[in-house]
A protein has these predicted regions:
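Flexible coil segments in periplasmic/lumen-exposed cytochrome c-class electron-transfer proteins
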Residues: 88-141
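Electrostatic cytochrome c docking/interface patches
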Residues: 3-31, 129, 136
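Stable alpha-helical elements in mature extracytoplasmic
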Residues: 23, 31, 73, 77, ...
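Gly/Gly-Pro-rich "capping" loops immediately C-terminal to redox-active cysteine motifs
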Residues: 28, 44-78, 97-105
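Extended surface/linker regions that mediate inter-domain or inter-protein docking
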Residues: 1-3, 116
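Mature, folded catalytic cores of secreted/periplasmic enzymes
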Residues: 53, 80, 131-134
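Periplasmic/extracellular electron-transfer cofactor-ligation site
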Residues: 22, 28-59, 83-94, 119-127
Length: 141
């Protein structure tokens, strides 16, 4: 489930569907077009992704279990993708190469991409991510 709170907008709820073959297939196509160039074809990310480059930017992290994507609830993943990390953490000068996908991808497309990413994780990681989502939901996140 994805919860996004935008200024002057109602709280929006989306449900990731990593078990829906149509959604996952759609997400795979969008991922290949919009994400794979930086995050890798299989979500492996860029090397040295924890260290800022000479340009001051962090390389794209992996979306596979070796990265931290699954450490974040769906609501944060959706917000980072749509609005950018700087807005999420309220630090407008935060340097990142991650594009903002608001007005580039629809909410449905963002959910499909996130569903595809989650569908790639092994069952134990998906279970842990579901637990993170449940804790976030209970805390009102």
């Amino acid at each position: 489930m994805v919860l996004v709170n935008r200024p002057s907008a109602k709280l929006q709820t989306y449900t990731l569907r990593p078990d829906d073959p149509q959604v996952v297939s759609f997400g795979a196509r969008i991922y290949a077009q919009q994400c794979a160039a930086c995050h890798g074809v299989r979500g492996e990310g860029q090397s040295d992704w924890r260290e800022r480059g000479t340009d001051g930017l962090l390389p794209a992290p992996p979306h596979d279990p070796s990265g931290h994507t699954w450490h974040h609830p769906d609501s944060q993943l959706f917000a980072i993708t749509k609005f950018g990390l700087a807005k999420l953490i309220e630090q407008p000068d935060y340097k990142t190469a991650m594009p903002i996908y608001d007005r580039v991808l629809s909410d449905h497309e963002i959910v499909a991409v996130l569903s595809w990413i989650k569908a790639q994780w092994p069952p134990d990681v998906r279970t842990r991510h579901d637990e993170i989502n449940e804790a976030a939901r209970k805390s009102g996140m």
